[in-house]
From Swiss-Prot:
ATP binds at residues 34-41. It is an enzyme of class 7 (translocase). It catalyses: phosphonate(out) + ATP + H2O = phosphonate(in) + ADP + phosphate + H(+). It comes from Rhodopseudomonas palustris (strain BisA53). This is Phosphonates import ATP-binding protein PhnC 2. GO terms for cellular component: plasma membrane. Gene3D superfamilies: P-loop containing nucleotide triphosphate hydrolases.
Length: 270
């Protein structure tokens, strides 16, 4: 189980994440929602330890993740694989090599520098690409792919890390509707077929409701909603997103004079 206890991250006097607490059982597909600047990305980066918490701690199966250093920290980052909005592929390298980068924590650095990847890792990478219909592109340069194809390669790279958790930070933010569905279906496959916990930052409420079995809503760095998608009423969503409600819900949902975020405090699950 992943447990977040009183997690806070401050930049100067501003708290990007403010006393966030929740627990996630293995195998869930959790959507983290909220307006821009709510603290969603910082939360995921702290779970992966790409950002350091100012206060609080993260536990995974009773291990204190916030105390990890050195090799133990590198192993945790492999077990909690990140997928980024920007794909983070190396454009000049072929697709297969980009996926193999997900095995860096498992091999000596001289092997990766010389690109002497073990055959079992190559087979694992090809299998991961095949899961997302990208095996035919294995020899192609990454910068020759479309955005949706690049994100599928990034998901395959995360899969070869053989993670316990996948942390997807706005993975479809720059994609068109067709590629958005393809990428979200790929994340759902990771979750349902492989049983990997997925925590995904999403701006679209429709996608969050359609794909996630639990939603965590953030506002001004705080967790202000935690529950099943069906518990997130349109009224709560309007309060959560405030001025961005039209964008994330569609014009047909807009009701003038929607309430402000502080009223959401009672929506957090006990």
């Amino acid at each position: 189980m992943l447990v977040v206890e009183g997690l806070t991250c401050r930049f100067g006097t501003k708290a990007a994440v403010d006393n966030a607490s929740f627990s996630i059982t293995p195998g869930g597909f959790v959507g983290v929602i909220g307006r821009s600047g709510a603290g969603k990305s910082t939360l995921l980066r702290m779970i992966n330890r790409l950002a350091e918490p100012s206060e609080g701690r993260i536990l995974f199966h009773d291990q204190d993740v916030t105390a990890l250093q050195g090799q133990a920290l590198r192993q945790w980052r492999a077990r909690s694989a990140m997928i980024f909005q920007q794909f983070n592929l190396i454009g000049r390298l072929d697709v297969l090599t980009n996926v193999l980068m997900g095995r860096l924590a498992e091999i000596p650095s001289w092997r990766s520098l010389a690109q002497l990847w073990p055959e079992k890792d190559k087979a694992l990478a090809m299998s991961a690409l095949d899961q997302f219909d990208m095996a035919a592109y294995a020899a192609q340069r990454a910068d020759q792919l479309s955005g949706g194809q690049q994100q599928r390669v990034a998901i395959a790279r995360a899969l070869v890390q053989q993670p316990d958790i996948v942390l997807a930070d706005e993975p479809i933010a720059s994609l068109d509707p067709r590629n958005t569905k393809i990428v979200m279906d790929a994340l759902l496959r990771i979750n349902k077929h492989f049983g990997i916990t997925v925590i995904c930052n999403l701006h679209s409420l429709d996608l969050a409701r359609n794909y996630c079995d639990r939603l965590i809503g953030m506002a001004s760095g705080r967790v202000v909603f935690d529950g099943a998608p069906e518990q997130l009423t349109d009224q709560i969503a309007r309060e959560l997103y405030d001025l961005e409600a039209n964008e994330v819900m569609g014009a047909e949902h807009h009701v003038p004079g929607a309430s402000s975020v502080p009223e959401l405090a009672g929506a957090v699950a006990a």
